[in-house]
């Protein structure tokens, strides 16, 4: 089982969109997937069509100080999987969600306590028999919840957009990962940068992608992700991009499948 955190320093770069695109690719490939929505805004939960019962959210698990295996008590099945099973006749598909909620914000302090960092790691104990992939959607900051996610993860993907401010933010994120490893007992085995919302015809965007390539080299994940309106329509309908019609949707879906293949082919 591979555990991957999707991080960003600020909102607006499409962090949750990247998480949803990877989940869509995993669903189509038949990869048994669990989504842990640590973002108090719960955009990934909404995008996956999940309406969780009251009290059934990841904040409840964190409040138990990371009881071993506790995440199983709050997971629900995404309608994406239910629909795919019905329409494609694939009864063995697995896509579960540990829903996000504003309750998680109680733990998202700027200054973290070392005793808090293992909460999610412990809550995930034992789920490796149920899933091949865990995607953690982090809050758009570098506070406690993001570091709780890093402590539980094998890999971290930092989402950037091709802008001056995002390039600087990505540098700070990668520096923070290195500092996290030096200052705690946890090690992130792999980190990468995904470039989202790229306008292929924009010289400014081309320049920023080249700048990111220069800064991060092999850590820059290929391919980049274009900013097509069809992706917004698919998300608005809470629909997997791999099942949305049209050439633009197919192109985006193919790129997410490539990124997922790279993630799963590397050792955790």
Label for each model-derived stretch:
Residues 1-268:
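P-loop NTP-binding core
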């Amino acid at each position: 089982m591979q555990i991957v955190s999707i991080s960003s320093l600020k909102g607006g770069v499409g962090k949750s969109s990247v998480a949803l695109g990877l989940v869509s690719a995993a669903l189509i490939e038949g990869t048994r997937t669990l989504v842990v929505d640590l973002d108090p805004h719960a955009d990934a939960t909404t995008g996956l069509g999940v309406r969780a019962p009251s009290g059934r959210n990841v904040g409840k698990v964190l409040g138990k100080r990371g009881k071993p295996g506790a995440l199983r008590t709050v997971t629900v099945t995404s309608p994406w999987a239910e629909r795919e099973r019905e329409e494609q006749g694939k009864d063995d598909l697995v896509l579960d969600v540990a829903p996000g909620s504003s309750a998680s914000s109680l733990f998202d302090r700027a200054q973290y306590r070392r005793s808090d960092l293992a909460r999610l790691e412990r809550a995930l104990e034992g789920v490796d028999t149920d899933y091949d992939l865990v995607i953690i959607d982090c809050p758009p900051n570098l506070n406690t919840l993001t570091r709780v996610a890093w402590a539980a993860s094998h890999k971290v993907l930092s989402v950037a957009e091709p802008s001056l401010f995002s390039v600087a933010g990505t540098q700070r994120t990668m520096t923070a990962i290195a500092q996290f490893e030096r200052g705690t007992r946890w090690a992130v085995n792999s980190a990468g940068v995904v470039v989202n919302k790229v306008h292929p015809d924009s010289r400014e965007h081309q320049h920023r992608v080249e700048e990111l390539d220069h800064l991060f080299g092999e850590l820059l994940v290929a391919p980049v992700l274009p900013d097509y309106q069809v992706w917004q329509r698919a998300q608005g309908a809470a629909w997997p991009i791999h099942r949305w019609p049209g050439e633009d949707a197919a192109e985006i879906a193919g790129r997410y499948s490539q990124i997922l293949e790279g993630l799963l082919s590397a050792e955790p």
